[in-house]
Design a protein with these regions (language model features):
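Phosphate/pyrophosphate- and phosphate-bearing ligand-binding catalytic cores of soluble enzymes
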Residues: 39-171
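DPxDG-like acidic metal-binding loop motif
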Residues: 20-25, 32
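N-terminal glycine-rich flavin-associated loop
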Residues: 1-2, 28-45
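Short Gly/Pro-enriched turn/cap motifs at secondary-structure boundaries
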Residues: 26-27, 96
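Anion-binding (especially nucleotide phosphate/pyrophosphate-binding) glycine-rich loop
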Residues: 1-21
């Protein structure tokens, strides 16, 4: 077996999508990316450094391109150990709310969970149209409709309410 990306198990995303936004859970995909091959009018290979990874960001977000493939830096590991790490990651994600969402919406604030801040502001269940703050995890917005506008309006409302109640600007 190969080890290094087990933390991604259970995240509802394609490899290209998770690289595009430097996704992850506890760790980020950038920690195991060697290079990314893209098409932006021509085929190019970007090194990890050229991808300019940061929190929920990569170069691919700044340029119009398709991610063709990704080379990962993985290491050989006992398959049973890899399997256990995957099971642990899946178990940790078993509490993630079901439904159509983009995962966590806001960054944590100074080490405090954005979900806890939103919950403390009394916003679990807040709705705009068919988008609502999950009752299971307040940093998830579930969209049962087709309108992204509902989600954007709800995000704006959450930011305003959290700022009013706590003086915190969620990002």
């Amino acid at each position: 077996g190969y080890s290094g990306a087990e933390f991604l198990a259970g995240i509802p995303a394609s490899l290209g999508g998770i690289v595009y936004m430097n996704g992850g859970a506890g760790k980020y995909i950038s920690e195991c990316v060697d290079s990314v091959r893209i098409f932006d009018g021509k085929i190019r290979e970007l090194s990890n450094k050229e991808c300019d990874f940061s929190y929920k960001h990569s170069t691919m977000r700044d340029i119009k391109c398709f991610i063709l493939d990704v080379k990962l830096r993985l290491k050989r590991e006992n398959p049973q150990i890899v399997r256990k790490k995957i099971e642990d990651a899946l178990s940790a994600r078993s509490h993630i709310p079901a439904g159509r969402s983009c995962g966590c919406v806001f960054e944590n604030y100074c080490g405090v969970s954005a979900g806890k801040i939103i919950e403390s502001a009394g916003l679990k269940g807040a709705t705009f149209g068919k988008a609502y703050v999950s009752r299971d995890h307040a940093n998830f917005i579930i969209n049962e409709g087709e309108r992204a506008e509902d989600v954007f309006r709800l995000i704006k409302y959450i930011k305003q309410e959290v700022y009013k109640k706590f003086g915190i600007t969620l990002k």
